[in-house]
């Protein structure tokens, strides 16, 4: 549900933390095909014709009009929903996966509103009685349902009914780490979208904080002692916690800063590159929130923190994968630049004829959270989902006819010239960065 940029309480209307967005007409985005669809598993079950279909099959060819596509997709979705209560665990898992792929690619609020109670009951049984992968898929579907239903009464009711189960699985040390990971993500996203009570927000923050805080012990080596099997869980819990910080009242932010800012740097020594990056981004977000509360905010252990960030920004250890080293250096250079100077690098996301500008760590965390759950469907939802457009300040959904779209589309030659110029500028910028990388030391 939309929240104010600087607000100290959850409320209806307005805009979320992260500032307003700018949108402009641009060339075709060239969005990639849904990578997640290639991972859809075919499952032997009582309804093989339903579960073997990918999302692209549901969407139909160009010869079929939009109405027929919608009806065809809804018929298949009805079959998926029916299979959620099947006796076979494989059938239920296949139905959950197919449902997840379909809902990430299309917007179907009316269809889901009519079946919200049925879906809630089915997901509750999957979370209660399912094991491992089934629980993980159920939590993933719940996250997408919250995005589809939005902050309205049905979305709030769905999240409230399943929130205790998500917390139960997340807090169960004997549960599958994969299931706990997806429950953490669903808890954070569901609370961000559908929770209306500050107490719900505080309880979710406390639960997520409890998951990763134990790895920030009193000793500096605590993070390195975490089993590799739990790295994904800690990363998901930390990211979900950071997402909820973007809508947390200022009075609570002050206590969280005092409690967590001295402890989070310990996670920078983790063996997991994803956990190190999640910790670095969370630290940058905490600094951003602290400076929002107090413009001349000063962190006591600034020198040691910047030293750790600088080490990761220039890391060249050969035992780490080359791709991981490159990604880590890029992100930690941005984190160090912000912590030291307070300037956040701006990112642009092009979708359709519009552009989304990400100019703060809060907006970065919010966008990444939705992108993680929607995959390449994020572009479709940015164009058509009123919830996301409200969150990022994109305004009403653009309605353009075929003639308008054709008029806006540039020629292949013009696109080639634009890409060539962009490539040249990017090469020059990277060359300068490589030449001066030693200056960080």
From Swiss-Prot:
**Family recorded in the similarity comment:** Belongs to the IFRD family.
Bias (Basic residues) occurs at: 1-15
Keywords for the protein's UniProt record, in alphabetical order: Translation regulation
- Identify this protein by name: Interferon-related developmental regulator 2
Q: Which region ranges are annotated with the description Disordered?
A: 1-51
One Gene Ontology molecular-function label: ribosome binding
Q: What does this protein do?
A: Ribosome-binding protein that acts as an inhibitor of mRNA translation by promoting ribosome inactivation. Associates with the P- and E-sites of the ribosome and inserts a C-terminal helix into the mRNA exit channel to preclude translation.
Question: Which residues form each disulfide bond in the chain?
Answer: none
Quaternary structure note: Associates with ribosomes; promoting ribosome inactivation.
A family per Pfam: IFRD
Which InterPro entries does the record cross-reference, listed alphabetically?
ARM-like (IPR011989), ARM-type_fold (IPR016024), IFRD (IPR039777), Interferon-rel_develop_reg_C (IPR006921), Interferon-rel_develop_reg_N (IPR007701)
SUPFAM superfamilies from the entry? ARM repeat
BP terms from Gene Ontology: adipose tissue development; fat cell differentiation; negative regulation of translation; regulation of translation; Wnt signaling pathway
């Amino acid at each position: 549900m939309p929240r104010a940029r600087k607000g100290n309480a959850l409320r209806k209307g307005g805009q979320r933390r992260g500032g307003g967005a700018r949108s402009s007409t641009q060339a075709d985005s060239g969005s990639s095909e849904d990578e997640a669809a290639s991972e859809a598993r075919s499952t032997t079950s009582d309804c093989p014709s339903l579960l073997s279909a990918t999302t692209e099959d549901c969407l139909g060819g160009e010869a079929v009009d939009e109405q027929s596509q919608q009806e065809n997709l809804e018929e298949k979705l009805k079959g998926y929903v029916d299979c959620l209560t099947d006796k076979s665990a494989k059938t239920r898992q296949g139905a959950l996966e197919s449902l997840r792929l379909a809902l990430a690619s299309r917007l179907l609020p009316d269809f889901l509103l009519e079946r919200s109670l049925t879906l809630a009951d089915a997901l509750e049984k999957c979370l209660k009685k399912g094991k491992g992968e089934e629980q993980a898929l159920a939590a993933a579907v719940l996250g997408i349902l919250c995005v589809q239903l939005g902050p309205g009464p049905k979305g709030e009711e769905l999240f409230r009914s399943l929130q205790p189960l998500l917390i139960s699985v997340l807090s169960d040390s004997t549960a599958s780490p994969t299931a706990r990971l997806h429950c953490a993500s669903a808890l954070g996203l569901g609370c961000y979208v559908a929770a209306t009570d500050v107490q719900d927000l505080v309880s979710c923050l406390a639960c997520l904080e409890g998951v990763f805080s134990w790895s920030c012990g009193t000793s500096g080596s605590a993070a390195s002692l975490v089993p590799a099997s739990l790295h994904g869980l800690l990363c998901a819990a930390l990211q979900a916690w950071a997402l909820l910080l973007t809508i947390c009242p200022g009075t609570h932010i002050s206590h969280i800063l005092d409690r967590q800012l001295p402890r989070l740097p310990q996670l920078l020594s983790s063996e997991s590159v994803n956990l190190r990056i999640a910790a670095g981004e969370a630290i940058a977000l905490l600094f951003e929130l602290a400076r929002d509360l107090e413009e001349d905010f000063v962190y006591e252990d600034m020198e040691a923190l910047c030293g750790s960030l600088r080490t990761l920004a220039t890391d060249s250890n050969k035992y780490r994968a080359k791709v991981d080293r490159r990604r880590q250096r890029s992100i930690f250079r941005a984190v160090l630049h912000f912590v030291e100077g307070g300037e956040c690098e701006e990112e642009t996301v092009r979708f359709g004829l519009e552009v989304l500008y990400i100019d703060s760590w809060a907006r970065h965390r919010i966008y990444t959270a939705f992108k993680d759950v929607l995959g390449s469907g994020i572009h479709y939802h940015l164009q058509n989902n009123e919830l996301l457009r409200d969150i990022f300040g994109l305004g009403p959904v653009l309605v353009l006819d075929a003639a308008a779209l054709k008029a806006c589309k540039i020629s292949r030659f013009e696109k080639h010239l634009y890409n060539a110029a962009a490539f040249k500028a990017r090469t020059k910028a990277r060359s300068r960065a490589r030449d001066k990388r030693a200056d960080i030391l």
